[in-house]
C-alpha cells in the first residue's frame, strides 16, 4: 500500500462510521459531488446515483470511476444539490505549487489550510438550497485566517448541524480535532444543531 501523503496531499481517509453518519445527515436528493474522494469511502456509497461525481487528484489511490483532476482546476458545467466529503488538511506551506497557483489568495493569508479553500469553492458550486456535509478541523469557526470564509458562509446560508468531536480520534492514527457539519445555502434560520442541543451560531 502506498503511504498516506499526509503533508502534501492531506490524505487522511474516512472511516465507515463517519461516512454513514454524514450520509445520514443528507437532506437533498439530486446531484452530488465528492470533491476529494481519496480511496472512495463516500464514492462507494453514492457512485450508482444518476448525477454523482467524484474527483481525486492522486491517480495512484483514486477509486474506480473517479475523475482524476485537481479540484481547483476542473471546470464544472453544473452546480450540485449536495457536496459531501473529507477535504484534505494541508498547511499553507505544504500545499503543492501546482495547486497553490490555482487558488484565489485575495482574501486569505499564509495561515490558511487547504481545506478552507475547498469549503470556499464548494459554496460557489451549490445549487439554491444546496448542502455541504463535511468533516474538517473545527478551528475554521473562529480562526482569524478564516474570517472571509465565515462571512461567506453567513451571507449565503446557515450551518444547520455542527458536531464537535474534540480530541476523539475520528481517523485511524490521526486526531486533528474535527467536527462533522452541514451547511445549507439560502437557509437563514441561524439555528445550529449541536451535541448539546440547538443554538444560534453567529460566524
Give the role of each language-model region:
Residues 2-23, 30, 36-64, 71-203:
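Signature of N6-adenine DNA methyltransferases within the class I
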Amino acid at each position: 500500500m502506498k503511504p498516506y501523503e499526509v503533508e502534501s496531499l492531506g490524505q487522511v481517509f474516512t472511516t465507515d462510521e463517519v461516512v454513514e453518519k454524514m450520509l445520514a445527515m443528507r437532506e437533498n436528493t439530486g446531484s452530488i459531488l465528492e470533491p476529494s474522494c481519496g480511496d472512495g469511502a463516500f464514492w462507494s456509497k453514492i457512485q450508482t446515483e444518476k448525477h454523482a461525481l467524484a474527483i481525486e487528484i492522486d491517480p495512484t489511490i483514486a477509486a474506480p470511476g473517479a475523475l482524476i483532476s485537481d479540484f481547483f482546476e476542473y471546470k464544472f458545467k453544473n452546480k450540485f444539490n449536495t457536496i459531501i466529503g473529507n477535504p484534505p488538511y494541508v498547511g499553507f506551506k505544504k500545499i503543492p505549487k501546482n495547486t497553490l497557483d490555482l487558488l484565489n489568495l485575495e482574501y486569505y493569508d499564509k495561515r490558511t489550510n487547504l481545506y478552507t479553500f475547498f469549503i470556499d469553492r464548494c459554496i460557489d458550486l451549490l445549487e439554491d438550497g444546496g448542502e455541504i456535509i463535511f468533516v474538517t478541523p473545527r478551528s475554521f469557526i473562529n480562526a482569524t485566517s478564516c474570517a472571509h470564509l465565515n462571512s461567506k458562509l453567513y451571507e449565503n446560508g446557515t450551518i444547520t448541524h455542527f458536531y464537535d468531536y474534540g480530541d476523539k480520534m475520528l481517523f485511524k492514527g490521526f486526531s486533528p480535532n474535527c467536527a462533522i457539519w452541514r451547511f445549507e445555502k439560502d437557509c437563514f434560520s441561524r439555528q445550529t444543531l449541536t451535541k448539546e442541543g440547538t443554538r444560534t451560531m453567529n460566524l
